[in-house]
């Protein structure tokens, strides 16, 4: 998605060899107009997939997932990283490792929110090692829901997450694919949605 790549060039900051800071529009401050366009793009890509729910994980996946759900006219559900007192139903639970935070979290969704046979589009902010996405896939398997696709806002193609998801037979759409960081700059690989630009 050229609009997203341009924004990464303008406001993204490369930290070291494997971190991209995008807190000016995605991971801290949210540019709702850009998120709306991202949501529309995911809805275009998955328009014929019969999506009944959009699922993400808190926190930075919420904005793009919400706009994708709005464009698809379906509910959006986010997996919580901490159980609160109101979550007293049966829970779908798994553990996910965060590459950026370097920690493992237990994530959960109420089993009442995902029904057997739901067709789920999983959206997340970043794809690095694939652990968050695979964790959400595992939650959907527990619910006997079908994952019809995974939409990643930004993918670090130099890490193994993409291959892990493709090896599981998943349909994957990444709107910005980073081939590498070079001299503090982002070098992009062709995005999965290039036919829509």
UniProtKB/Swiss-Prot annotation:
It catalyses: XMP + diphosphate = xanthine + 5-phospho-alpha-D-ribose 1-diphosphate. GO terms for biological process: purine ribonucleoside salvage; xanthine metabolic process; XMP salvage. It is found in: Cytoplasm. CDD domains: PRTases_typeI. Xanthine binds at residues 20, 27, 156. GO terms for cellular component: cytoplasm. Pfam families: Pribosyltran. Its EC number is 2.4.2.22. Pathway: Purine metabolism; XMP biosynthesis via salvage pathway; XMP from xanthine: step 1/1. One of its GO terms (molecular function) is xanthine phosphoribosyltransferase activity. Keywords: Cytoplasm, Glycosyltransferase, Purine salvage, Transferase. Belongs to the purine/pyrimidine phosphoribosyltransferase family. Xpt subfamily. Converts the preformed base xanthine, a product of nucleic acid breakdown, to xanthosine 5'-monophosphate (XMP), so it can be reused for RNA or DNA synthesis. This is Xanthine phosphoribosyltransferase. It comes from Lactococcus lactis subsp. lactis (strain IL1403) (Streptococcus lactis).
């Amino acid at each position: 998605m050229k609009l997203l790549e341009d924004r990464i060039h303008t406001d993204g900051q490369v930290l070291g060899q494997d971190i991209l800071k995008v807190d000016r529009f995605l991971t801290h401050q949210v540019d709702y107009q850009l998120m709306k366009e991202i949501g529309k793009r995911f809805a275009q890509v998955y328009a014929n997939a019969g999506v009944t729910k959009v699922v993400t994980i808190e926190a930075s996946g919420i904005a793009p997932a919400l706009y994708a759900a709005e464009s698809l006219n379906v509910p959006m559900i986010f997996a919580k990283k901490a159980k609160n007192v109101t979550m007293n139903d049966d829970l779908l639970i798994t553990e996910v490792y965060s590459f950026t935070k370097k920690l493992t979290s237990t994530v959960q969704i109420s089993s009442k929110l995902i029904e057997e046979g739901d067709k789920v589009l999983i959206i997340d902010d970043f794809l690095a090692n694939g652990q968050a996405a695979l964790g959400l896939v595992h939650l959907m398997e527990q619910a006997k829901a079908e994952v019809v696709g995974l939409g990643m806002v930004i993918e670090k193609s130099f890490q193994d997450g993409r291959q892990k998801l493709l090896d599981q037979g998943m349909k994957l759409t990444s709107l910005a694919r980073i081939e590498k960081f070079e001299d503090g700059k982002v070098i992009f690989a062709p995005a999965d949605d290039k036919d829509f630009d």
